[in-house]
Design a protein with these regions (language model features):
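Accessory interaction regions appended to the cores of large information-processing enzymes
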Residues: 1-110
């Protein structure tokens, strides 16, 4: 996995053989009721494999789990993903955990 901090958007890309996934997260100091979800379409011809609602569900579950384990709230403000990336959506639970764990241990050196 490769991690990036792009002006406060914490990003991870994962490529494993033919499978590929991208996730970008923006965090908030306070809980956010209406999380902004951006489904990026890289190619107009590429089918949308991922559903925004399901990706958001997995991201929020991953953030809740990590917040509980790390005893610190991680509130999601914005989610970015590529709509044509690989299934299953459950990978976004794990990608969220990976971003939060790295942010928790590396801080500004993310």
């Amino acid at each position: 996995m490769k991690f990036f901090n792009d002006n406060g958007i914490y990003k991870v890309s994962r490529i494993s053989g033919p499978l590929h996934n991208y996730l970008g997260l923006v965090f908030s100091d306070v809980p956010v009721a209406d999380v902004d979800v951006v489904a990026i379409k890289l190619d107009a011809k590429e089918p949308e494999r991922l559903r925004s609602k399901e990706v958001l569900k997995q991201v929020l579950a991953g953030a809740e789990h990590s917040s509980r384990v790390l005893s610190r709230p991680y509130n999601i403000k914005k989610v970015e993903f590529v709509s044509g990336d690989s299934l299953p959506e459950e990978i976004y639970f794990h990608l969220t955990q990976a971003i939060i764990e790295r942010l928790h241990t590396e801080g500004e050196n993310f």
